[in-house]
Amino acid sequence: MEKRLLDYEVGETVELFLLIKSSVKGTASNGKPFLSLVLQDKSGELEAKLWDVKESDEINYGVQQIVHLMGDIQNYRGRKQLKIRQIRQASPLDGVSASEFMETAPINKDEMADEITQYIFEMKNANLQRITRALLKKYQDDFYDYPAAMRHHHEFVSGLSFHVVSMLRLAKSVADLYPTVNRDLLYAGVILHDLGKVIELSGPVSTTYTLEGNLIGHISIVVEEVSKIAEELSIDGEEVVVLKHVLLSHHGKGEWGSPKPPLVREAEILHQIDLMDASLNMMDKVLKHTKPGEFSERVFGLDNRSFYNPTFE
C-alpha cells in the first residue's frame, strides 16, 4: 500500500502530493519572510516551514492549494515536522483533487444520521425532543459535514457527527449503569453540545475560526440557538433552563471555557464523556503511527504527553 504522510518515520525522505490546510506568514530572526504551513493527507497533518519566500509564494502556497513536494521528516521538540527541499503547485495534469487529501469519519453520514435519529426517537420528554429535533433539522447539512474542531480531536470531515455518535453510545452505557440518569436530558446535551461549531468554524476544508467563533464561541452560540428555538416552539420552563446549563457547563471549568461548572448529574456525565471521547481520539491518532515498544510524539491537547504503545495484545 502506498505510504501516506504520517506513515513516514523521522529521517525518511518524503515525495508526495499534499493539501495546504493553513499558511501563515512570519519573519525570521534574519528579517527574511517565511511561511508556516500545515500540510495534510488522509493520514493526518504535519507542520512545515518554507523559508525565504517571495510575494508570489504567499499566493501559490496559500490555504486549499495542492502541492507536490520533496522533503525530510525531522523531530522538532518531540513532534514530527517536515523539512521542505522542493515544492511546486499541482497542475491539472497531475489529476489530483482536494477530496483525496481529506480524512473522513469511519462511519458514513447516512448511518450516523439514522443512529442519531433513533436516539431522538427514544426521548420521552416532548419539550427536549422537539428542541433537539428542530435544531438538528435547522443545521443538519453542516452538522454531518463539519469537523468537531480545528485541531486536536475529530478534526476531519464529518468529525462533529462522529464525535456525537460516539458520545451517544457512551451516554447510553452510562445511563444503563446508573438508572437515576435522565436519558432525555443527557441525549439532548450530547447531540447539541457542539452544534455551535457549525457557526464557530468555517467548514470541513482548511478549517478556520469565523468571526463569531473568535468573538463568541460555540458554547454561547448554541445556548443562544436553544433560547431562540424554544421561543419559536413556545416552550418554556425548567427543561429549557437545565438544558442550557448542561450545554454551558460541558467544558467543566471556567478556564476551559465554561461559565458554570456542572451542577446536575447529566451535565457532569456530558463533560466526562466529551473529555473521554476527545482524549481517546487524540491518543488513537498518534498511537496508530507509533511502533509497539515505543513512545508516541507529544500530544499538545493532552498536556504535551507522549504515550507508550505496549508490545503485548
Swiss-Prot record:
KW DNA-binding (keyword) present: yes
The HD domain, residue ranges: 163-279
DNA-binding region residue numbers: 22-90
Keyword terms of this UniProt record: DNA-binding, Exonuclease, Hydrolase, Nuclease
One BP annotation, GO: rRNA 3'-end processing
Gene3D superfamilies in alphabetical order: Hypothetical protein af1432, Nucleic acid-binding proteins
Pfam families xref list: HD
GO molecular function, a single term: DNA binding
EC numbers on record: 3.1.-.-
Membrane-crossing segments per the record: none
Domain of life: Bacteria
Stretches assigned to coiled coil: none
Record's function text: Shows a 3'-5' exoribonuclease activity.
Family statement drawn from the similarity comment of this UniProt entry: Belongs to the YhaM family.
Protein name: 3'-5' exoribonuclease YhaM
